[in-house]
Amino acid sequence: MSAPSESIAAIEASAVRFREDFAKVRHEIAKAVVGHRAVVDGVLVGLFAGGHVLLEGVPGLGKTLLIRSLSEALHLRFSRIQFTPDLMPADVTGTTIVVETERGREFQFRRGPIFAQIVLADEINRATPKTQSALLEAMQERSVTVGGTTHELEKPFFVMATQNPIEQEGTYPLPEAQLDRFFFKLEVGYSSREELIEILDRTTTGKSPAIERVLDAASIVEHQKLVRQVHVPAEVQDFAVRLVMATHPQGPFATPMVNRFLRFGASPRAAQTIALAAKVQALLDGRSQASFDDVKGSVLPAMRHRCLMNFEAEAEGVDADEVLRNILETVPASAS
């Protein structure tokens, strides 16, 4: 079923401003972050789609700088939570305290750092599962319950978490069910020679320009609503569904590589993520409906953290990205 022509015209007109605002934020981030264009775009796709993003990379690659730069480019309240083994759930969500008032002693809720619009959860896998779940519950419900009282989180609410892939001692890896709550998992790689030279020029000579605020909360919420209005044709939707089902071992669309190397495949949230990311990409291209290529472009960041590899994959050095590329090569766009 296609969208009405009036709706198509309205979406395409709004797409112009969406594309301009996306480019403005990207430009401001680039003032501080050298390179990592795909990672920056992935973070912005997650923001405008209304999801949360997990960044993985070794220390010193600019993950925290990217997130700080984004908060500076947006007129949003920012907080950073450094996850450590001794961090308690109340340190994240807040706690109820007793205060002296004119009327005597009263209970008062003191808000934790989760009550911001952009939250950096730094080294999330260093905290205990109990503390991790406090953050992840807020991500899912967009609210915090303390002492039987529910406190709504302000819109937009965007969490970016970081984790280090090599320091495994003293860490608590996120369980699959909690990883599933992240819209994208983005891998931050090393900079090129030219990028490293540019980093040195900016950080050792005082050349780094100031980041300007180019977007506010109301504009972001408006863009998030626009994304939901983009049409996904039935055949494109079916392609996204078949890609997700192809990750299910022994399923009707599973490839031989999936059957060999995967223990569990992606959940329905993966299909939702792929569809929303495809809608964002369509808007960036000035279109009112998503295409097969839009779907293909979001498969890796949407599903790499939702596929659980088996022992044979670990022994053979096969990762989720390799299996997902095989699926993209094997599953045809058209079902016919």
Question: Where on the chain are the PLM-derived regions?
Answer:
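Conserved C-terminal "switch" segment of AAA+ ATPases
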Residues: 11-19, 32, 171, 185-257, ...
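Walker A/P-loop
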Residues: 47-85
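C-terminal engagement/docking regions of AAA+ P-loop ATPases
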Residues: 1-12, 249-336
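Walker B catalytic acidic pair
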Residues: 57, 122-123, 134
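Canonical AAA+ ATPase core
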Residues: 99-105, 127-131, 139-230, 279-281
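P-loop (Walker A) phosphate-binding loop of NTP-binding proteins
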Residues: 58, 92, 162
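Conserved alpha-helical scaffold flanking the Walker A/P-loop in AAA+ ATPase domains
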Residues: 42-45, 98-120
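Pre-Walker A (pre-P-loop) alpha-helix and adjacent loop at the N terminus of AAA/AAA+ ATPase modules
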Residues: 14-61
